[in-house]
Amino acid sequence: MASRLLRGVGALAAQALRRTARGAAVTRSMASGGGVPTDEEQATGLEREIMIAAQKGLDPYNMLPPKAASGTKEDPNLVPSISNKRIVGCICEEDNCTVIWFWLHKGESQRCPNCGTHYKLVPHQMAH
């Protein structure tokens, strides 16, 4: 009995709060305010910065996978780094379940010790 009473009182209170001075109930809809904001309108801070960069075709925080090249000596896979060396993992074959890790140093392109794919270290500046 008490739960029915409280539920009814809550509904009446909600209706009273929605009424304006003229007595008409105020309704709020997504269409009246312009609809649901898009991701671009709602994003702030770092998320907004990343979205703007993505629209320009940039990847300031290296979130996307690197673009694979042919891996030959003339066209090596470019590996961005802020230092003079970086550790690189090569899967070698598409269905391989192990990763071959090796150090890549600044300068000439270097080969994966297992499959022979070439990688080259390129300087990268941080976005800050």
UniProtKB/Swiss-Prot annotation:
| GO MF, any single term | metal ion binding
Q: Name one GO biological process term.
A: mitochondrial electron transport, cytochrome c to oxygen
A Pfam family reported for this protein in Swiss-Prot or TrEMBL: COX5B
Q: Which cysteines are joined by disulfide bonds?
A: none
Transmembrane stretches, by residue range? Answer: none
- Residues reported to bind Zn(2+): C90, C92, C112, C115
| A GO CC term attached to the entry | mitochondrial inner membrane
Give the keywords, sorted: Acetylation, Membrane, Metal-binding, Mitochondrion, Mitochondrion inner membrane, Transit peptide, Zinc
What range does the transit peptide cover?
A: 1-30
Q: Which domain of life is it from?
A: Eukaryota
Subunit structure and binding partners: Component of the cytochrome c oxidase (complex IV, CIV), a multisubunit enzyme composed of 14 subunits. The complex is composed of a catalytic core of 3 subunits MT-CO1, MT-CO2 and MT-CO3, encoded in the mitochondrial DNA, and 11 supernumerary subunits COX4I, COX5A, COX5B, COX6A, COX6B, COX6C, COX7A, COX7B, COX7C, COX8 and NDUFA4, which are encoded in the nuclear genome.
State what this protein does: Component of the cytochrome c oxidase, the last enzyme in the mitochondrial electron transport chain which drives oxidative phosphorylation. The respiratory chain contains 3 multisubunit complexes succinate dehydrogenase (complex II, CII), ubiquinol-cytochrome c oxidoreductase (cytochrome b-c1 complex, complex III, CIII) and cytochrome c oxidase (complex IV, CIV), that cooperate to transfer electrons derived from NADH and succinate to molecular oxygen, creating an electrochemical gradient over the inner membrane that drives transmembrane transport and the ATP synthase.
Q: Which family does it belong to?
A: Belongs to the cytochrome c oxidase subunit 5B family.
The name on file for this protein is Cytochrome c oxidase subunit 5B, mitochondrial
Question: Which species is this UniProt entry from?
Answer: Mus musculus (Mouse)
Q: Which gene encodes it?
A: Cox5b
